């Protein structure tokens, strides 16, 4: 995959997300290597938990932790690692871990991909049980890994998500 050819934004309201980890997959953390374009196994998680949503990143962005902006894509189906999916950001999970701030953008597929998410415009439109599952996952997925921890500090709205995405794009443009 030539990541250099994939833009961060498809248009003003749509972001491109490169999937690293499919929803409900085994307890394996994959990471996309930007130089080779390959998906590597980062580690086998010690907890027997699976990601509640498809997990990936926005290309050509840089978050406060030095990695691309992370995204959880709410969908009905697992998406193959390395796939690019067009999404709309609807909110953000605010959290910290042993490396610092580590926010997760919450996004849904665009109408062209799946019209069943058209009603979700803001984080408040996302199912409460799914939000609880997301929080539970991130509060516990590192529990058995020595020296690792996560603290979920809350949820923020679409405006905050959009702001974090823009900041991530600007960091890369200044490099």
From Swiss-Prot:
Show the Pfam families listed in the entry.
Pyrophosphatase
Q: Which cofactors are named for this entry?
A: Mg(2+)
User: Any idea which UniProt keywords this protein has?
Assistant: Cytoplasm, Hydrolase, Magnesium, Metal-binding
Q: Which residues bind Mg(2+) 2?
A: 70
The annotated subunit structure for this chain is: Homohexamer.
What this chain does, per the entry, is described as: Catalyzes the hydrolysis of inorganic pyrophosphate (PPi) forming two phosphate ions.
Q: What is this protein called?
A: Inorganic pyrophosphatase
Species assigned in the record: Rickettsia bellii (strain RML369-C)
């Amino acid at each position: 995959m030539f990541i250099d050819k994939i833009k961060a934004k498809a248009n003003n309201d749509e972001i491109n997300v490169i999937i690293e980890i499919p929803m409900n997959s085994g307890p394996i953390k994959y990471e996309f290597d930007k130089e080779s374009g390959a998906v590597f196994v980062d580690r086998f998680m010690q907890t027997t938990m699976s990601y509640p949503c498809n997990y990936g990143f926005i290309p050509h962005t840089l978050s406060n932790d030095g990695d691309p902006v992370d995204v959880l894509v709410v969908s009905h189906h697992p998406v193959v690692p390395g796939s690019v999916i067009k999404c709309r950001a609807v909110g953000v999970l605010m959290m910290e871990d042993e490396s610092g701030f580590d926010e997760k953008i919450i996004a849904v597929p665009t109408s062209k991909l799946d019209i069943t998410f058209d009603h979700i415009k803001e984080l408040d439109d996302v199912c409460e049980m799914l939000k609880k599952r997301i929080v539970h996952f991130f509060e516990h997925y590192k529990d058995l890994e020595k020296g690792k921890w996560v603290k979920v500090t809350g949820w923020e709205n679409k405006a905050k998500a959009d702001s974090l995405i823009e900041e991530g794009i600007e960091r890369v443009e200044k490099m």
